[in-house]
């Protein structure tokens, strides 16, 4: 039967020699060897201790932990773009097994989260049912690719035996505090004595019945401790999406203030939420990037996200209140002509109340069309409620409201107006700015819009036209209280202003960060429940390990309570709140049986992926998330300077900040508490590119099936109608997805692997073209013919000795492929293999190539095309799997040419090419050049007045 695919380039399987390598034969070979690998546990990597240890065997000291960013099990299944990274890591792992390393490589499933829940709601099927079906389908698809995973180590975040340990790690973080002196997390149990002795003071602003911890009552003591925890409840501004019925993290909100999923409006409002104190680790998260072998782009993205900056906090007095601002440019204080607070700033209402609450005589541009500051603040807050932080920062149109209050500039005593404006956020700095419009673009735009003074304090620009934001000497910057920075450069001026502020008790030097604490709760059903209950006083209590896992209850109605998408005043009502028998419990937490209420939020989808690499190490351990001996073996540091961590982590750059930042934070807490020996989760990170494809839309903008589009005279048609071509990502919604199942059926999995690896460098994106897949298949057919006769299936290799040319070609191929494998340059691995196959085919096509030339080739291609390599290895007479056969070694002597070709220039023009011994002297090269017939013809009757010889490169003769 002839199989077809959309391209029409299916190998012809209905005719030809009986033993040709066809799609059908490839399928048989692949299924056979995949079963062999399963039956023999070929890719099972042993641990030092525990269930996965092998008794009596000493583990190799040389080991490798390779990890993929684990997939989300979507109902749509995989398209050919998804396996790109998985194939690459499999190739790298297989190559390293041939180097004798103990290789850990497996794959799990990140199965909790909003997509599964939304899909389940749409189909009426429980998310567990759809998730398990999706995992099974993905395992089938990935299994067909011949990926060398250790199946014993696979995990799913939705498995209670997995999320038991997610909850356990949450509790370790909950029961820890950050010691700023030691710059590390410590158990809460070590904090209590320090509070009792007074060595650690009560939190700033804490209001209790006494001034010392020891004199507080039990409830107050618990509240004090909660103020220190690395996990805490915060009544803070969050992104509330009524249409989805849940709070969203910043990364889940689009720039125009809508939910990434569902495109619903998102509103900023204050709610009580779980937060993780990731900001405590800001410095370590930045500084330890220097320890990592990561792309510079990713390191830069993390540094920018954390946003460490040095400057000063400055205090401005305003009617008995102090407005504190953070600035990196205290040298520009003399140019501050107004202040702007975030609309949500805690002082706004108090400042309005302290003022006259009148707009009499005020510029109408300052009033937002209202009669009083109180009315204007209320109206303005309502107008910006749906704006995301990103939209507020990027908005070119500056808006704001005058609070009816002025503040005093501390360096010159000037009274300056105080506004609120949406371009100032509570999430960075102090939520208030001193506006210096002459030297800040956004302040300049605001001042221009509201008619505010613009005063130059840094020389070098033309402030009549635009803000000057470059460096320059300070001007107009002196007072009569001992501060004069005129003429100083930026750094000198900053230092003097900070010194003056400290002396006058008007400010202090400060390091600030953009990074905010991590919002760690979702009002959904399909996520990890919190291992926390609340008593009658509303105090949170961590559950003991014996009560883990806290399993999701089976409920009939798991839909979130959603609201009118525009109802900004709605409040979250999590689905778990409906399970009253589950939420209301009686527990003995060490002080007798009492009634408690469970937390009805769930953890965000990031939770499981923040630590899953550690469970891969010890997936069957029921006593710990990971035995530290196993962790030390696989990810422990190998020197004092080594951070430790997974040896190679491959995934998309879209996870450069959030997932990687969160996992680094969790790992550092575990390190501080002594649960792991590695300081970082991932030593080396590699971002693969993407496989992209053409998509087509009709006149309505609707996508049409790409495989049914025809090209005629440079135009594209679908069912006779001309359509538009666009290029980008591959996906089901774009109707241009190609399933790996189809390619495996029509060509074989090895062909798919070879094609994807050969398309281009792994870290770049590349276009998919089904019609080009046939080229990879033909390469494998040529490889097959070097070993197997297509006519009768006999082995065609000979015992002939290798010629010098054979040895040169072989050893250069070995050296090149080995180097490229190590550098993840798999596209050039394939190119070198093709070149060597072509050489052997040309040299021995009719007589049979020497076994000594072919066997190393089969070994070298085994990492990329493992099924055909296993089959050829077996047919060559070997009984064991090729998986652990040592990768061939090369000899240096065969890498050097005996002769090299050199161009000969005469008066600057190439007139001949000569072959000279590789070690020839300049005099010898000159003699060979002059003896060349081509050279002799061009210099006949002329004098050679100069000879220039560059060994190994060229000869230049100057003649007259």
From Swiss-Prot:
Which gene codes for it?
leuS
Q: In terms of domain of life, where is this protein from? A: Bacteria
Indicate which residues form the motif 'HIGH' region: 71-82
Instruction: List, alphabetically, the Pfam families matched.
Output: Anticodon_1, tRNA-synt_1_2, tRNA-synt_1g
Question: What is the official name of this protein in its record?
Answer: Leucine--tRNA ligase
| EC annotation from Swiss-Prot or TrEMBL | 6.1.1.4
Q: Which family does it belong to?
A: Belongs to the class-I aminoacyl-tRNA synthetase family.
- In its keyword annotation, does this UniProt entry include Nucleotide-binding? yes
Record's subcellular location: Cytoplasm
Could you name the Gene Ontology cellular component terms for this entry? cytosol
Q: Recite the UniProt keywords alphabetically.
A: Aminoacyl-tRNA synthetase, ATP-binding, Cytoplasm, Ligase, Nucleotide-binding, Protein biosynthesis
Reactions this protein catalyses: tRNA(Leu) + L-leucine + ATP = L-leucyl-tRNA(Leu) + AMP + diphosphate
The organism is: Corynebacterium diphtheriae (strain ATCC 700971 / NCTC 13129 / Biotype gravis)
């Amino acid at each position: 039967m002839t199989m077809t695919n959309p391209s029409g380039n299916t190998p012809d399987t209905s005719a030809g020699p009986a033993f040709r390598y066809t799609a059908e034969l490839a399928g048989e070979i692949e299924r056979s060897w995949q079963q062999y690998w399963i039956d023999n546990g070929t890719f099972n990597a042993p641990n030092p201790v525990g269930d996965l240890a092998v008794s009596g065997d000493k583990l190799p000291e040389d080991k490798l932990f390779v990890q993929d960013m684990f997939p989300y099990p979507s109902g749509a299944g995989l398209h050919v773009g998804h396996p790109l990274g998985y194939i690459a890591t499999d190739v790298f792992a297989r190559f390293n097994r041939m180097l004798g390393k103990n290789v850990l490589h497996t794959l799990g499933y990140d199965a909790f989260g909003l997509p599964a829940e939304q899909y389940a709601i749409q189909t009426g099927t429980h998310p567990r049912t759809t998730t398990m079906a999706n995992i099974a389908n993905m395992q089938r698809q990935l299994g067909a690719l011949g990926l060398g995973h250790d199946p014993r180590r696979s995990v799913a975040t939705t498995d209670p035996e997995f999320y038991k340990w997610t909850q356990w790690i949450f509790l370790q973080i909950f029961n820890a505090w950050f010691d700023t002196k030691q710059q590390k997390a410590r158990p809460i149990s070590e904090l209590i004595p320090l509070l009792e002795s007074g060595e650690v003071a009560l939190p700033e602003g804490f209001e209790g019945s006494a001034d010392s911890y020891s004199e507080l009552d039990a409830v107050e003591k618990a509240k004090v401790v909660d103020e220190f925890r690395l996990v805490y409840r915060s009544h803070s501004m969050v992104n509330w999406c009524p249409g989805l019925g849940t709070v969203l993290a910043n990364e889940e909100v689009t720039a125009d203030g809508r939910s990434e999923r569902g495109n619903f409006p998102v509103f900023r409002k204050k709610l009580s939420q779980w937060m993780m104190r990731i900001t405590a680790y800001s410095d370590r998260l930045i500084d330890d990037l220097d320890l990592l072998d990561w792309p510079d782009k990713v390191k830069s993205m993390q540094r920018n996200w954390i946003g460490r900056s040095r400057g000063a906090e400055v205090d401005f007095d305003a009617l008995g209140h102090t407005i504190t601002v953070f600035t990196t440019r205290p040298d520009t204080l003399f140019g501050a002509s107004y202040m702007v607070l975030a609309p949500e700033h805690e002082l706004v209402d108090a400042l309005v109340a302290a003022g006259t609450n009148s707009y009499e005589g005020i510029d109408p541009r300052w009033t937002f069309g209202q009669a009083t500051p109180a009315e204007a603040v209320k109206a303005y807050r309502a107008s910006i409620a749906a704006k995301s932080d990103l939209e507020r920062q990027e908005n070119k149109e500056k808006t704001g409201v005058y609070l009816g209050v002025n503040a005093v500039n501390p360096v010159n005593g000037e009274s300056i107006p105080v506004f609120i404006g949406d371009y100032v956020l509570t999430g960075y700095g102090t939520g208030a700015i001193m506006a210096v419009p002459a030297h800040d673009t956004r302040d300049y735009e605001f001042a221009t819009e509201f008619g505010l003074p613009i005063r130059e304090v840094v020389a070098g620009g033309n402030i009549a036209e635009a803000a000057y934001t470059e460096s320059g000497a300070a001007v107009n910057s002196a007072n009569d209280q001992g501060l004069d920075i005129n003429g100083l450069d930026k750094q000198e001026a900053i230092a003097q202003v900070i010194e003056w502020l400290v002396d006058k008790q008007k400010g202090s030097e400060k390091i600030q960060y953009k990074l905010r604490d991590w919002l760690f709760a979702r009002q959904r059903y399909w996520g990890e429940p919190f291992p926390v209950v609340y008593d009658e006083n509303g105090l949170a209590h961590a559950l003991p390990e014996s009560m883990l896992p806290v399993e999701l209850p089976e409920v009939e109605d798991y839909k979130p309570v959603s609201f009118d998408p525009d109802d900004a005043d709605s409040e979250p009502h999590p689905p778990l709140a409906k399970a009253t028998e589950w939420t209301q419990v009686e527990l003995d937490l060490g002080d007798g049986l009492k009634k408690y209420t469970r937390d009805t939020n769930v953890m965000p989808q990031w939770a499981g992926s923040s630590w899953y690499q550690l469970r891969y190490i010890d997936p069957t351990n029921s006593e710990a998330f990971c035995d530290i001996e196993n962790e030390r073996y696989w990810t422990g540091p190998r020197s004092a300077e080594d951070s430790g961590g997974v040896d190679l982590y491959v995934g998309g750059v879209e996870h450069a900040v959030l997932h990687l930042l969160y996992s680094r934070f969790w790992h550092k807490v575990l390190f501080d508490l002594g649960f792991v020996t590695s300081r970082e989760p991932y030593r080396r990170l590699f971002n693969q590119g993407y496989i992209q494809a053409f998509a087509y839309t009709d006149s309505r903008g609707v996508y049409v099936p790409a495989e049914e589009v025809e090209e005629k005279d440079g135009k594209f048609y679908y069912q006779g109608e001309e359509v538009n071509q666009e290029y980008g990502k591959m996906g089901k919604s774009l109707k241009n997805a190609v399933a790996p199942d189809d390619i495996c059926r029509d060509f074989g999995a090895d062909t798919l692997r070879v094609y994807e690896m050969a398309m281009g460098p792994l870290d770049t994106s590349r276009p998919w073209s089904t019609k080009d897949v046939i080229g990879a298949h033909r390469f494998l057919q040529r490889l097959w013919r070097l070993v197997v006769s297509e006519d009768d299936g006999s082995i065609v290799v000979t015992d002939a000795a290798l010629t010098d040319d054979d040895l040169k070609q072989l050893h250069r191929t070995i050296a090149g492929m080995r180097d490229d494998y190590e550098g993840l340059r798999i596209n050039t691995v394939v190119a070198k293999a093709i070149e060597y196959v072509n050489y052997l085919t040309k040299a021995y096509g009719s007589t049979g190539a020497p076994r000594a030339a072919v066997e190393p080739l089969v070994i070298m291609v085994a990492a990329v095309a493992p099924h055909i390599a296993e089959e050829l290895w077996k047919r060559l007479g070997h009984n064991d799997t090729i998986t652990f056969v040592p990768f061939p070694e090369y000899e240096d002597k065969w890498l050097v040419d005996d002769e090299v070709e050199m161009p000969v220039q005469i008066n600057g023009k190439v007139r001949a090419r000569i072959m000279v011994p590789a070690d020839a002297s300049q005099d010898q090269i000159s003699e060979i050049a002059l003896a060349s017939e081509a050279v002799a013809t061009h210099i006949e009757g002329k004098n050679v007045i100069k000879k220039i010889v560059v060994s190994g490169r060229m000869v230049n003769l100057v003649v007259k």
